[in-house]
């Protein structure tokens, strides 16, 4: 009886230690994400939109939009902490994607469950909260759809990756737009703007340490090279690059297995 009681005490103590360690890890991870979100406040001036901390007065549904996008991003990142085997870095947020979803290379239609025919479900992105659209319904009744988002998510999922095993981000984390065309436009960030995004990119890579990093296109490759990070460069799927992207990302994924 005495031996049984001692064993139970040891087991209970071990469980308590493991639980305490897991709680500490979760707290540290949560703190890291919150610190990262605060770092994203530091967007450069000019024709740059910060979806997590600014309101798009012309196209947002209401003034709660930035807080909603922060919740989306937080849930997306938390789902992947400690599980990522592949990091994919794009160029910059697009107005059809992260501008309204708050998540790189992810459209509102993905979050709203309107890309299931492409094999992409909202729970692939996150499942801890319910997604909410932030764009007003007048401009795009079904929510915005971004071709790059659909191609990247669809390709990675079809190649058998679990959604929490890969994380998508951008070399320039904010949305650079054409000031003459307005918020609903995209442009390549300038070198000065890209330099302003380096700190956020470095912090992101520290949050998700990973041996396999993929750069979509030349801007992402240039930023990663400046950080002395090893990476695989693949064709960006935009502007007719979808076929080559799928071929190249498949090779990278095969090497990962």
What name fits each language-model region?
Residues 218-219:
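Alpha-helix/helix-capping structural signal
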Residues 229-255:
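Short, flexible loop segments at boundaries between secondary-structure elements
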Residues 29-212, 222, 227, 232:
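A polyanion-binding, active-site-adjacent surface
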């Amino acid at each position: 009886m005495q031996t049984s009681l001692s064993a139970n005490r040891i087991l209970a103590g071990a469980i308590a230690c493991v639980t305490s360690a897991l709680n500490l890890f979760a707290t540290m991870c949560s703190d890291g994400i919150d610190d990262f979100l605060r770092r994203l406040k530091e967007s450069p001036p000019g024709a740059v939109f910060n979806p997590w901390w600014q309101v798009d007065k012309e196209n947002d549904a209401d003034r709660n939009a930035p807080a909603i996008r922060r919740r989306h991003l937080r849930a997306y990142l938390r789902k992947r902490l400690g599980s990522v085997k592949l990091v994919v870095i794009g160029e910059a947020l697009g107005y059809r994607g992260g501008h309204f979803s708050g998540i790189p290379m992810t459209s509102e239609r993905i979050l709203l469950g309107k890309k299931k025919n492409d094999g992409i479900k909202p729970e692939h992105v996150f499942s801890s909260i319910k997604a909410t659209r932030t764009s007003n319904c007048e401009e795009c009744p079904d929510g915005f759809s971004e071709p790059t988002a659909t191609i990247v998510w669809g390709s990675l999922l079809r190649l058998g990756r679990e959604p929490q095993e890969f994380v998508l981000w951008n070399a320039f984390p904010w949305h650079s737009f054409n000031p003459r065309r307005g918020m609903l436009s995209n442009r390549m960030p300038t070198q000065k703007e890209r330099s302003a995004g380096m700190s956020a990119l470095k912090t992101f890579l520290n949050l998700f340490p990973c041996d396999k990093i993929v750069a979509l296109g030349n801007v992402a490759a240039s930023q990663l090279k400046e950080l002395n990070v090893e990476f695989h460069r693949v064709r960006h799927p935009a502007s007719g690059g979808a076929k080559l992207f799928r071929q190249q990302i498949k090779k990278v994924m095969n090497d990962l297995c």
